[in-house]
């Protein structure tokens, strides 16, 4: 089986790794980065991904970032490039870029991947991630939770050690905490909790809000309505946040943020901590809930692992230390651990890594709506997956011909307060008094955490089964169409690059040809130089017209003409260089030479003696 790459599809940054020998290795991107910004931009019809997209975000309004926060939102669309894109499509562009540079590194086609998701992602978000992989041309072998992947990266070389681990994962847009037990190569998740809308972006937003409010007070101008100003503020807020992880203050300088007005502020670490205190506090709840669900106290925890770039914030580290009573373990890179863990899981699937078993859990309870709008749970949160569970229900009215199955995910007692995963109907139930029909509802969760539900009339044997497909989720036809679109975009991008390369070659050829003509001067006649000059003029015209085929044709013509000119120069240089080796005027023997000159002044053969270098010693 070919290699399975591990991808951390992050809110702010993404990373990819592969197993090499006994250890996972991060694959660097074309810019040399170990992580790639999860940013997509559209420029003149071209799709840009990663560093190049992020660099021009300030000047390009068609730049999309943090799309992960909208995965699974059925009605969310991004307008760009004259089209509307779903979050899955934008994510697929990031995955496609990662797939390409992984292939360049490995020197082979990559078909399979393990992709990570926040532990607290619901079914719709997981399915959307899997769809994004499919659109990008990847067979998603497994969806695994980010904290679990980080634990794999941490524990791969500690398989013989029994320990309980708390993984605190605060990324760019999501927060997870998982409690795991490691022993004899088994990584068992005991519980998980989190917040899919808490991350580094929220810390940035606090700084942005502070700057906007302060600027409005001082100048009476509201920058929150200026998209260009907001992008500049976002960039500076992120830089200030990173600076404050190692320094006590950060300078924020934004000249001409509005007309001739500037921002010149100093943000201290103490101010930043005050601005973001509620976010740090908000992260404590999921930690406490996860510990409670695992049935453990903090004294039972052997290691606290920090994962995600936002765990570099000193106030976050202090909060974790205060809450758990333990010094966090910094042995793994918080930006890379998840991708490394995903690569390990890929190697477990291929059989390249043995003696490792991963037992993950479902993050949220699953059930159906029953009489009175109540949610009746069939599978409780933190149940080890894969799993299945069945329960028998009945009709709510006499002679009821059909049963509507409303599938829910969440922890609230009332159906309306939970997440709807889907609806389906079991029909043709024979007429019978209320409570008599026996309807067996079965839930099945696979290793990816994706849910299937079936309902069966035990009296007739009639059944109905669905893999949860929200109305907003992608159908197979839609996915196939997007796969084709992605492939055509790849072809268009390839064509665009070829055009750019051609233009660069043309510019170089024009420059070198003009230089050659200038250097030739009077060494050759106009008749020799004319074919090159004519071909050069033709190529310049073709360059202005931007007709690719004509440009190729004229480029080839100039190259041939320039080559012919070079041959003539070489031929002329031959006799000249031979003559230059003599010390007299052309046509005469040099002084003291043994050459003889005829009466007509022409040079005739002269005697010469070969000098042996040894004779000079």
Swiss-Prot record:
GO MF annotation terms: ATP binding; ATP-dependent protein folding chaperone; unfolded protein binding
Disordered, as annotated region: 573-617
Biased composition (Basic and acidic residues): 596-617
Low complexity bias (residue ranges): 573-590
Record carries keyword Coiled coil: no
Modification Phosphothreonine occurs at: 174
Keyword terms of this UniProt record: ATP-binding, Chaperone, Nucleotide-binding, Phosphoprotein, Stress response
Record family assignment: Belongs to the heat shock protein 70 family.
Function: Acts as a chaperone.
Name of the featured protein: Chaperone protein DnaK
Lineage of the species this protein comes from: Bacteria, Bacillati, Bacillota, Bacilli, Lactobacillales
